[in-house]
Amino acid sequence: MPEIALVVGLGRSGVSVARHLHERGARVLALDDTPDDQVRAHATRLGIDLVEAPDLAALTALVNEADVIVPSPGVPLAHPVFELASAHGVPVRGEVELAFRWTELPLVAVTGTNGKTTVTALIAEMLTASEVPAVAGGNIGLPLSDAVRRDVEVVVAEVSSFQLWFTDTFRPKVGVWLNVAEDHLDWHGHVDSYAAAKARIWAHQLKGDLAVANADDPVVSRYATDAPARVETFGLVEPADWRVVDGVLVGPPGEVIAVSELRRSLPHDVANALAASAAALAAGGTLAG
């Protein structure tokens, strides 16, 4: 546990991680360039020091004082705190990374440009229907550092490219990568950087873990060939482990559900259901669930 943590940005995840760091005995410093009264109230309630829009000298002093820097997902990479952290050898770890380190619960993580909120919710619903207590969190609403404290057996996390960028040991038991399209290039600069950030969902998995990959997305498929975990694919066009046969969703364990029984059955809905089924079964769900 770091003795002094600098949390950059007191949004939803920033407040959550600041609270948990404080409860774990760290001295928490908070930096916010555009604080409002709510941000100030959060800092006061948490009993942490809030520094508002520091100049470069003050920011340098803060970085030098910190043992770790924890940026909120919306902080741009161009923010000088990152260059200073690199120059002064201070590690940068996101809330998702810290939450992973704080729990022994198995994690199912979902990323992708489109569909990740839907698939995250679907997996949690499938597990619950299978009588496996689960909670959805991460980018979906409940910060991951809060979700891992729930009385559940599995945590299902929506994780963005921003959140994955600042991970260095994050290892979901099941990592689902849905797709890649050009997005957030103002933050990443190039689609290759964006895809590389997404690929970190699989980077630290082990052979006993599962990588769920979209066979119809060439970028995802390319990265899947280097995934250290076991890979299961899903798709509607290319050959895949999870697919539709005669109007029925099927996977290695057998038939799941008829397309006609899905609440929504557009192609992307079917693909989402395939991905969610693969992940939920790997996390302890049942075909009935």
Model-derived segments and spans:
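Short amphipathic alpha-helical face segments that pack within enzyme cores
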Residues: 16, 122, 143-145, 272-278
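N-terminal leader/targeting and accessory segments in enzymes
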Residues: 1-94, 98, 265, 285-288
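Adenine nucleotide phosphate-binding catalytic loops in nucleotide-utilizing enzymes
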Residues: 3, 8-10, 44, 62-63, ...
